[in-house]
Design a protein with these regions (language model features):
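Active-site pre-lysine segment of PLP-dependent enzymes
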Residues: 1-2, 12-37, 42-91
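Hydrophobic residues in well-ordered beta-strands that form the structural core
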Residues: 7, 38-40, 120
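Active-site C-terminal subdomain of aminotransferase-like
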Residues: 74-75, 104-124
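Short beta-strand-to-turn element immediately C-terminal to the catalytic PLP-Schiff-base lysine
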Residues: 96-103
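Structural motif of enzymes handling amino- and sulfur-group chemistry
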Residues: 103, 120-135, 140-141
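Structural signature of PLP-dependent enzymes
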Residues: 109-114, 131-154
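Conserved glycine-rich beta-strand-loop-beta hairpin in the small C-terminal domain of fold type I
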Residues: 125, 129, 145-153, 163-171
Length: 171
């Protein structure tokens, strides 16, 4: 049986592995051949650790999005990217998130949301708008998480544990 939806996480939970553009493009091509919607959890995309020192300024790696033209060929058909501001903007209690992608799929989600009473409060929408316009606080959060991550890695490796695939996210 062919699935209706393929859900992917990149950065992955719990490994922190990041799917490269080439792999994501293959997933999209396969899904389109089989009429499968691809939904991608990209909530930790701003917490990409694949640079020498996340505390230093300068160019950094970014987690590729399902909606990147190099991945989707410029068409969002059959694709949904799910994004939360919980970690990057420290808005976990706000339940601040959004879905982007295929306009037809988004319209269906909006209808369900409207009739199910799942409204995002106005103040939360305003906070999201401010947060999405400000990259500086995201860099600050990345720095905080990066420092904590290094302390944890050192402690875990100090007792003989091995860390694998931890490229991004909180993992």
């Amino acid at each position: 049986t062919t699935p209706k939806v393929l859900w992917i996480n990149s950065p992955g939970n719990p490994t922190g592995a990041v799917l490269p553009v080439e792999h994501l493009a293959k997933v999209v091509a396969w899904a389109r051949r089989h009429g499968v919607v691809v939904a991608a959890d990209e909530c930790y995309a701003e917490l990409d650790w694949r640079q020498p020192d996340p505390r230093r300024p300068g160019p950094r790696h970014t987690t590729p999005s399902l909606l990147d033209p190099a991945v989707c060929g410029g068409s969002h058909e059959g694709l949904l990217a799910v994004y939360s501001l919980s970690k990057q903007s420290n808005l976990a209690g706000y339940r601040a998130a959004f879905v982007a992608g295929d306009p037809a799929l988004i319209a269906g989600l909006v209808e369900v949301r409207r009739h199910a009473g799942m409204m995002v409060p106005g103040p939360v929408q305003a906070a999201m708008t401010v947060a999405l316009r400000d990259d500086e606080h995201v860099a600050d959060q990345r720095l905080r998480y990066g420092v904590r991550r290094e302390i944890l890695i050192e402690a875990l490796e100090g007792v003989g544990l091995r860390i694998e695939h931890s490229e991004a996210g909180l993992y």
